[in-house]
Amino acid sequence: MTNTRKTHPLIKIINHSFIDLPAPSNISTWWNFGSLLGLCLAIQILTGLFLAMHYTSDTTTAFSSVTHICRDVNYGWLIRYTHANGASMFFICLFLHVGRGVYYGSYTYFETWNIGVILLLAVMATAFMGYVLPWGQMSFWGATVITNLLSAIPYIGTTLVEWIWGGFSVDKATLTRFFAFHFILPFIIAALVMIHLLFLHETGSNNPSGLISNSDKIPFHPYYTIKDILGVLLLILILMILVLFSPDLLGDPDNYTPANPLSTPLHIKPEWYFLFAYAILRSIPNKLGGVLALVFSILILMLFPLLHLSKQRSMMFRPLSQCMFWILVTDLITLTWIGGQPVEYPYNIIGQLASILYFTIILLILPIISLIENKLLKW
């Protein structure tokens, strides 16, 4: 009798995706982050669901409902901080996952890569709206500043901002709709993840060498399920250390002050995972220019398949490209640091230089180096 796992209409989909899936025999730990992102999404949806049971999306009670969750709900503090720090873990995994894709040339799987970029944008939108919900000072002013950027769009900008706000300022209507969007988006993300996997399984996974591995495949289970479990345990360990020992390490103290439209915080800044984009936005004096740079700093990822001029897929055997890649990583870390600093000398100059370097490396230096490496192959 044939195994149910291979014949049952529903179970066989799971079987072909996670059990009998042929996987390259040499994929490294950098390939763990896909499954870790799935785990992060599950954690966020579950903790978010329990938070939504106690949260009220009204400007008068939102802040106190979060306080109520932390003080009066059984393990409410644990759920709330797991959700807040879970978002940070989500973004750490996301950045590493994207970085791995850039380093090993995974972006040549065009559809998988582009859906991945759309996923990144959807997660960023969800995280931004989630940050507004506790209705602290940074929530309110963050929402005001970021939504206000849309007013830079010529002709329709102001109307668009007021339409998003549901009034003439960030108020009750804004909070209510942000809560609605924040609730629905993770499920849209989950659907996009399935499409992401569908396209990935059409081609199979890439591997560190960037070579075709059809002649050397192993089943996903037990080899990579065991390998993923190690990643899962480490992720949960780091998340729990964060939640139980320093839950506010990555947060902003200003958000423990209820939102007050009459008092502006000294430094308005988003959560740490948006700081690199925020630094790029601030480094351009013109409002529309800044907004375009901000959007393009993420959308530039979609250009990677077009800018790939190397004869080799992976950077594994391309030392010059490797050097540039790590300079790009340090540049992004620098931008993250600058995004959290006030706009004054020398930070503004460093931010402008780092922003120019970011776009120059991706659009100019990496493609040129790829061509040089192609020439070096003939030596």
Curated annotation (Swiss-Prot):
GO MF, any single term: ubiquinol-cytochrome-c reductase activity
Co-factor: note: Binds 2 heme b groups non-covalently.
Ligand binding (heme b b566): 97, 196
Disulphide bridges: none
Residues annotated for heme b b562 binding in this entry: 83, 182
Gene3D superfamilies with a match to the protein in the record: Cytochrome Bc1 Complex, Chain C
GO cellular component: mitochondrial inner membrane; respiratory chain complex III
PANTHER family, A to Z: CYTOCHROME B
Record's miscellaneous remark: Heme 1 (or BL or b562) is low-potential and absorbs at about 562 nm, and heme 2 (or BH or b566) is high-potential and absorbs at about 566 nm.
Assembly behavior: The cytochrome bc1 complex contains 11 subunits: 3 respiratory subunits (MT-CYB, CYC1 and UQCRFS1), 2 core proteins (UQCRC1 and UQCRC2) and 6 low-molecular weight proteins (UQCRH/QCR6, UQCRB/QCR7, UQCRQ/QCR8, UQCR10/QCR9, UQCR11/QCR10 and a cleavage product of UQCRFS1). This cytochrome bc1 complex then forms a dimer.
Protein's UniProt name: Cytochrome b
Native species: Marmota sibirica
